[in-house]
Amino acid sequence: SLPLHVLAHPQPSTSTSLAGRAGAVDLNEFRVAHRSSYASHDEMKKLPSIASFRQGTYLEVATELVKQTMPNMEFRLVDDHYVGDSGIGHVRFRQTMHGIDIDNSDFNVNVGKDGKILSHGNSFYTGPAPASNPMIKRDFIDPMQALNGVRKALNLPVKADGAHVENMSEHKVMFKGTSGALSDPTAKLCYMAKEDGSLALTWRVETDIGDNWLLSYMDAKESSKVHNVVDYVAHATFQVYKWGLADPTEGKRDILTNPWNLKTSPLTWLADGKTNFTATRGNNAIAQYNPDGGNDYENNYRPSPKNLKFEYPYSPDMNPPKTYIDASVTQLFYTSNVCHDLYYMLGFNEKAGNFQVNNRGQGGKGNDYVILNAQDGSGTNNANFATPPDGQPGRMRAYIWTRANPPRDASFEAGTIIHEYTHGLSNRLCGGPANSRCLNALESGGMGEGWGDFYATAVRLKPNDTRKTNYVKGGWVNNSPKGVRMYPYSTDMNVNPLVYTSNNKLNEVHAIGTVWCTMLYEVLWNLIDKHGKNDGPVPVFENGVPNDGKYLAMKLVMDGMAIQPCNPNFVQARDAILDADMNLTKGANKCEIWKGFAKRGLGVGAKFDPKNRTG
């Protein structure tokens, strides 16, 4: 299986380290470097050769572009191409060398509704090629040496004494007989394009150890050198805080009858097309109590009430937390399912790689609901989400927060759960459903956090809110009026002074994500001021376009995720949102989008340089 991405820790730490172990390694030292370029719609219009492309299917047009742009390059088509609900054909290619993948060298092409190329992203390697196929002489370390090298270099709690190797394909093996990982580790021989412009032959060792699901690129010539590490974890009736209430301070719980949307969950939330369930389990998610933090979720406790009445007592004053576990699991199940349904309406459907057991013949890969662990015992004061490629379940862990007395349960802070679920959204869309490794550079990883905050904030907007309304992230669960971010989200520069060049002094993804969400908050209010705000729980579409500013912003940001290149920077992600608007509305909101970004230093003159961004 391809690696996942555990992202989504809403509470920042001083470093991104391997969770829960003394002497843990700082994974920031192994982040993937930014290598992508992005040719926007405006740039594509300036290329006469593109306009003369022969007409064909969107796959043929995309393939022809790669052949012309990167002549004599070896590449393969990734099998996750699809046409999104906005009419854009998304096609991705992986560069190969001697038949071996270059794992961080991708080319994504976006073909518009008119059959012409809208934009493309490119991180193909253009340096010197290895003279010979390494498979001929096999002059590289064996995979077991690579696994042991990764274990030692990253201080992993995986034991391999007595383990053996089983071949899965020509370039991939599985390790049987290990202990300490939640599933059998694997290793795949691949190249990695390095920051210095050279190419390294590596073993990509995949280890799922719970709070971290790692893809570690061990040098295939020396077993003590790790080049990069990708972490997939960036950590009836229902009585619940209904959608739009961010936490228990914003309202009371209601009893909702059949709260699912049959257009987006036609099997309901309590069935998968084969079985009708009476517990918190269905096509989109499976939720349970997980006090030991383990991986055996199937047999864990989950509420299964008579007559499907998921109605349980809860108040924030109850203690200890396990006394209200039924209410906690129910709330987590509800919020995550509403996320599924709303994101489906906005374009995160089966073809785009969403999370469902049964895709009902609508495309994509099934068997991948979200595993929802309430009151997970593997940590406190946090939450995380692991996003493997399409076809493998996502995994969310919601923890108890100990900053208040009595402790508070993350399941009841919708902003935290929406933030986590959005990690699944952004990791499946950026780079395509088959590649969950495209938000691992520092700036792209920061945007992953920012998108989570953006959707959580947009959802909680109230009818009387204006552009003068400020919001903090994580205030209730952290028992802090300031929340867990540097500044509130605000359009007032005196309340939140963050601009693009602020990133020059930031080296942590949650901090960088705060800058990104601040920019999106500006765009959000520009669009609301132009188009109004729909305060209902679902968007209203006219010719495929949300007819209000709030849902339009959410739609354009989501479309931009699928358009942008792998591991984008802020400038490229901004351009992808502009291109999304060009495709959806013919650029009707170009000025509002530009003004929002420009106010925060990401205008026309903004330049990305990891050490000296300018704006």
UniProtKB/Swiss-Prot annotation:
Cofactors: Zn(2+)
GO molecular function, one term: metalloendopeptidase activity
Cofactor remark: Binds 1 zinc ion per subunit.
Transmembrane intervals: none
Active-site residues, record numbering mapped to chain: E420
Coiled coil: none
PROSITE patterns the UniProt entry points to: ZINC_PROTEASE
GO biological process: proteolysis
Identification of the protein by name: Extracellular metalloproteinase 1
Family of the protein in this entry: Belongs to the peptidase M36 family.
